[in-house]
């Protein structure tokens, strides 16, 4: 009964996940069993040596004593055999009382270990056979390595070139991305700025109120006039022709700039007066809708006001300049045979036509073609 209790207590089914753990434990148990067997062998060896000593002593003794000892040994052997028979009977009785479940558990626990041990011994004895999958993997790895090396060589050897000199340059769109990322933008360094173009100034009085801006920077007009006066004095003192030509161009550009600014100022004044009159007429009820000036009407009023503010000498010079400008413009638009030239110079044609510009036609700003003496055809 002791053996059945021992088997029922220690034997249990082994799960597949714990096979390695139990295999390690079984290995440790086998090692401990080997150690125990060695110790028992050493003890039996020592017992054997003692028995040999006793036999030697007995052999040295009397033969009668030896006979008595032999009889005693025979009796002891018979007793031992009887004891062994009783023990075997007890073991068989206990095994017959063991349940089939306990035997199945014991067989399940012993079976896989023996298979694993046999497989391990076979693998240790027999060399590992080459697998076809390993060969395929090795070939694929070699092919990839060769392809990588070929691509590296091509990149080094080939240079970006154009098919012709007229073709656009070839540039790769692949660029390495920097590992650094701007998480927080640093504060911008303040730059020097012109207050005339400052958005804060323009928002307050620039675009919304141009009149306020012009009034705020009215002192610049005085600076420009002083600068023009200094340029004229320097032009009078300079004797070098190159410097005189440069000063002359600068003076002309400055005068044109001042003249354009005066014209714009005059236009603003005329528009302001016209708006004021129209508002007054609407307020009085004489008009229901305001009249907006056209560009041509505005230009005429600006020119009229400009000539009114001039003295007689300046007005004459301005009219003469305007007349020459208009005549030259109309002359360019005419054919070569009808262009008016000074004196008796005729255009290329041998003098068949005589071109003149009578004073009466010049006053109205037109040119005439004189085909015969005494006849004038105004265009």
From Swiss-Prot:
Chain spans, region Disordered: 14-219, 313-350
Keywords: Coiled coil, Nucleus, Ribonucleoprotein, Ribosome biogenesis, rRNA processing
Compositionally skewed regions (Basic and acidic residues) per UniProt: 134-161, 327-342
Annotated compartments: Nucleus, Nucleolus
Chief location category: nucleus
Pfam families, alphabetized: RRP36
Family (UniProt): Belongs to the RRP36 family.
Subunit structure: Associates with 90S and pre-40S pre-ribosomal particles.
UniProt protein name: rRNA biogenesis protein rrp36
Species classification: Eukaryota, Fungi, Dikarya, Ascomycota, Pezizomycotina
């Amino acid at each position: 009964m002791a053996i059945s209790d021992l088997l029922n207590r220690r034997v249990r089914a082994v799960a597949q996940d714990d096979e390695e753990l139990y295999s390690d434990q079984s290995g440790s148990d086998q090692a401990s069993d080997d150690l125990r067997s060695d110790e028992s062998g050493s003890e039996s060896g020592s017992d054997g040596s003692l028995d040999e000593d006793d036999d030697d002593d007995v052999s040295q003794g009397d033969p009668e004593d030896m006979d008595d000892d032999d009889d005693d040994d025979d009796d002891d052997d018979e007793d031992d055999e009887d004891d062994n028979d009783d023990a075997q009977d007890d073991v068989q009785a206990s095994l017959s009382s063991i349940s089939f479940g306990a035997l199945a558990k014991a067989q399940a626990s012993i079976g896989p270990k023996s298979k694993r041990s046999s497989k391990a011994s076979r693998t240790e004895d027999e060399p590992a056979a080459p697998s076809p999958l390993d060969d395929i993997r090795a070939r694929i790895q070699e092919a990839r390595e060769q392809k990588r090396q070929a691509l590296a060589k091509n990149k080094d050897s080939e240079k970006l070139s154009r098919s012709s000199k007229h073709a656009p340059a070839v540039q790769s769109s692949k660029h390495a991305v920097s590992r650094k990322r701007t998480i927080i933008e640093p504060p911008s360094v303040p730059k020097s700025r012109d207050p005339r173009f400052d958005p804060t100034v323009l928002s307050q009085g620039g675009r919304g109120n141009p009149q306020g801006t012009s009034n705020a920077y009215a002192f610049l007009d005085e600076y420009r006039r002083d600068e023009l006066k200094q340029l004229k004095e320097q032009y009078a003192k300079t004797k070098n022709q190159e410097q005189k030509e440069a000063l002359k161009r600068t003076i002309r550009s400055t005068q044109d700039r001042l003249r354009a600014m005066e014209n714009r100022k005059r236009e603003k004044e005329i528009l302001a007066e016209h708006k004021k009159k129209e508002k007054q007429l609407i307020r009085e009820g004489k008009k229901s809708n305001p009249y907006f000036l056209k560009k041509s009407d505005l230009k005429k009023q600006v020119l009229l006001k400009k000539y009114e503010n001039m003295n007689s000498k300046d007005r004459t010079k301005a009219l003469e300049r305007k007349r020459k400008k208009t005549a030259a413009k109309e002359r360019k638009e005419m054919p070569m045979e009808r262009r008016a030239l000074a004196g008796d110079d005729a255009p290329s044609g041998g003098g068949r036509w005589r071109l003149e510009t009578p004073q009466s036609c010049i006053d109205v700003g037109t040119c005439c073609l004189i085909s015969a003496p005494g006849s004038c055809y105004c265009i």
